[in-house]
């Protein structure tokens, strides 16, 4: 029987997904791959359905305040990590009303400075201006809100990643996202992606942390490009970065008021999902987000890796969803045009060096 590449991927994705693919190379009796420290611990994810973005965001965070409070009370300031992969397309970027919703949640309870931060692929401050963050910060002067271009701040820690040839290469990660005094809030959206299937909270943190040259700096350099070394290497490097950032993650806020389908993360089309998702477990938040987008959860490799390594719960059976039900808010997002190539991380590697020993 002749099976096309398209038919193969759809068949595998529909029947067991990642498990089915791994079964081709795993011998009989191979134990499940998991490093979860406490398999009995469940995560809570709140889903709020509504029509007012700002209120939905605040309501989602308030729903899990009992989990946020014990940690944030030990911190000195709040970092809101936005997602401005584009500095000109609002659909691809965190909306100012999302930030307002976060501030509405924070201010009555937690009187501490707030820094809105980003390391955009382009000019970070251009995005801050275009999307209304500069006005927001000015209007919030009494709340001690500031804007920080992480590229211009130029403070970092170095971690090793792998390149296409599996050799080590250094990458500079924004130090502020690793500051133990900061309570880090991820403010992102529901979007499809051109490399890793879907981008939600983990992707926002992991690819927002690597820096590039500061404005007017020469010679130019860009550590974000080091993640685009190969479809398999990308997922693994994202895992390594998530592992480094994870101890400083506070709460993930996924703004699904208007998601993006098709050719995300910058050039897709809007989907009126009208939801907000919040959790102190970024991996669980993203699993619920993927479900709400109607995406096969086996497809985003980096999220499966993070779940296997115990960075959070990716198993839907270990997630308590409060508020709206997934089935009631789920929409089937159209995938990126390159989805077939994106899924090639799942199969066997064909061009490998010889085996020795």
PLM-predicted stretches and their roles:
Residues 2-357:
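N-terminal and secondary-structure boundary signal
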